[in-house]
Amino acid sequence: MRYDYFHYTERDRKFYEEHLKDRMPREFIDAHTHINLPEHIADVPGERIRDDWALQNGMHMTAEDAAYYYDTLFPDQKWSLTAFPYPIREVHMEANNDYVSRCADTGEIAYGLMCIKPEYSVEYLEQELTEKNFSGVKPYPDMVSGKKGADIGIFQFMPHSHLALVEKMGLPVVMHLPRAGRMPDDAN
């Protein structure tokens, strides 16, 4: 489902040619892309979307749609994606993770990260990371709180056992820090 508001115009092309084309690297990787299918986000309440500017700016994007957008916006560049589900509690996470893994299998994305929930057992997590095409994990505070900047600690949404497993497997963790102060917060 491409967004109705996305229209690439002659003005856009001209701006790209005059201001961006020669400044852009020939190859780049977007290391933070959310992909999903409509059924993965069907249960996200409308009020949740209205209360969060990020959710209002495009909750749904398939890997195919992402390719269309990137090809349109960056016609002279070779691009690749690191992608993962939208990491909020109401998403059908297991199905969305499967979709991300399949997209990595087919080469639609370069790297897929598994969005993890704190309640996942270490055994389940290890099985998924071993048997499916995931290059790392994406824990997120929303899996505990449902609120941005919530006053929770890192190990509430990424238990020590999960961290130990991904360290053992040598996998990266892409993490948004919790708490309103983010990086400078002493509890982080």
Q: How would you name each of these model-derived features?
A:
Residues 39-42, 184-188:
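Histidine/acidic-residue-rich catalytic or RNA/ligand-binding cores of hydrolases
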Residues 2-12, 80, 88-181:
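Active-site gating/metal-coordination segments in enzymes
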Residues 55-70, 93-102, 155-160, 185-188:
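Well-ordered, non-membrane alpha-helical segments in soluble/globular domains
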Residues 1-86, 91-92, 130:
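An N-terminally biased module of ancient metal coordination in phosphate/nucleic-acid-related enzymes
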Residues 48-55, 101, 120, 149, ...:
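Solvent-exposed, non-transmembrane amphipathic alpha-helical segments
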